[in-house]
A protein has these predicted regions:
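Class I S-adenosyl-L-methionine
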Residues: 82, 135-138, 143-262
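Conserved SAM-binding loop of SAM-dependent methyltransferases across substrates and taxa
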Residues: 6, 22-35
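Mobile active-site "lid"/loop adjacent to the S-adenosyl-L-methionine
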Residues: 47, 83-124, 141-148, 175-177
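Short glycine-centered segments of the SAM/dcSAM-binding site in methyltransferase folds
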Residues: 13-14, 38, 65, 84, ...
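Polybasic, low-complexity RNA-engagement segments
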Residues: 201-204, 211-367
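Conserved class I S-adenosyl-L-methionine
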Residues: 12-21, 40
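S-adenosyl-L-methionine
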Residues: 42-80
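Helix-to-beta-strand junctions that scaffold the AdoMet/dcAdoMet cofactor pocket
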Residues: 33-34, 130-132
Length: 367
């Protein structure tokens, strides 16, 4: 996760992961930010964005706005908005040949010159979304200088960008300024990972700073607000559910998309008119006046946040039965409860007598 480490986001910042799926980098950013601030995680592929949603939910992130748009569309919505932007751009994939035979077979279809042109368009959009004084990390999984050092040379020549040198760690080596036309020594400020010299595949990472003075983000205090009358009705049903089943209070700006209720993340006061999958914390479904909690909600909470928990110890066979979606049995009070592996929530059950209705998502279940 060197790209996320190089970006070094701080709690409370506005961060964009522009090519985010399947989500490993986004979750690494989220852990560093401690669910404070905003991560806009985008992927242009509708299929890949589904995996992004699942991984964000598995990690219990609540500050993430997951979108499915082109960079060109996003730059219209977010001019000079972000403190930091991560660009793990599509590339020719030469660094993955050893690991992924399909990458080698498809190499002839993804010519390096074509990839470099796409990468430059992505950076153009990202540059317009980055605040003056903001940080951008550019990374690929290819060896080709055309997509790496030569692109960085183009960026610092054509934009108000400068290289912020990365120190080699963990088997990384300095990037190769001698492979560029200008031979500018600052172009050795990026990093390369060679698979024959270190554990891992081939990667390139470079950190860039946009020239100018950085403005601090505006302070936003806690508030309770609804984006529509329907959202307020759904939120009231959620508050009733929380009063009966939870020990914690969730406040913020509530938004209803269809029957799905969300608590919006920090800095997102309303949902812009773009294609999106998840906005902050997905609380659950509101249908026919009733609220049913989501898997996302249980993953975002701690065991002490629930009024009822069903705790399984290590090696208890009921853990596997739960993850397979099987019905469990237990003596206890009727209502919703969190199933926990020791102290870690796994998902919901709904107790009715001795029977526990398994609410673990079907798409997550073990086969």
């Amino acid at each position: 996760m060197m790209p996320a480490q190089a970006l070094c986001p701080q709690p409370g910042e506005k961060v964009l992961d522009l090519c985010a799926a399947p989500g490993g980098k986004t979750t690494a950013l989220g852990c560093r930010m401690q669910n404070k601030g905003l991560i806009v995680a985008n992927d242009i592929s509708p299929k890949r964005v589904k995996a992004l949603v699942k991984n964000v939910e598995l990690m219990g992130l609540t500050n993430t706005f997951i979108v499915n748009e082109s960079p060109e569309r996003l730059r219209q919505i977010y001019p000079e908005f972000f403190d930091r932007i991560l660009l793990d751009v599509p590339c020719s994939g030469e660094g993955m040949f050893r690991k992924d035979r399909e990458a080698a077979q498809s190499w002839s279809r993804y010519k390096s010159d074509e990839c470099a042109a796409i990468q430059r368009e992505i950076v153009k959009s990202a540059y317009e979304m980055l605040k003056p004084g903001g940080t951008m990390v550019y990374s690929t999984c290819t060896f080709n200088p055309r997509e790496n050092e030569e692109n960085i040379e183009f960026f610092i020549k054509n934009y108000e960008l400068m290289i912020d040198k990365l120190e080699p760690i963990g088997g990384f080596e300095p990037s190769r300024s001698e492979w560029t036309q200008s031979k500018d020594p600052t172009l050795s400020g990026g990093l390369r990972l060679w698979p024959h010299k270190a554990e891992g595949e081939g990667h390139f990472v470079c950190r860039l700073i946009k020239k100018g003075n950085k403005k601090d983000n505006e302070e936003i205090g806690p508030e309770l607000r609804y984006t529509s009358k329907e959202a307020e009705q759904a939120a009231q049903a959620f508050f009733e559910f929380a009063g009966e089943n939870m020990n914690t209070v969730v406040q913020g700006i509530f938004h209803l998309k269809g029957s799905s209720l969300f608590k919006l993340p920090h800095y997102l006061n309303e949902v812009p008119h773009i294609k999106w999958e998840k906005a902050g914390l997905y609380l659950g479904e509101y249908k026919k006046g009733r609220f049913e909690p989501s898997q996302s909600l249980v993953m975002a909470l701690k065991k002490e946040d629930f009024k009822r928990i069903i705790r399984f110890e290590k090696n208890d066979h009921n853990i596997i039965r739960y993850l397979k979606g099987e019905t469990l049995f237990n003596d206890g009070e009727n209502g919703f409860a969190a199933v926990c592996y020791e102290d870690f929530p796994l998902g919901w059950v709904k107790q009715d007598g001795q029977m526990l209705k398994n609410m673990y998502p079907k798409s997550w279940r073990m086969m």
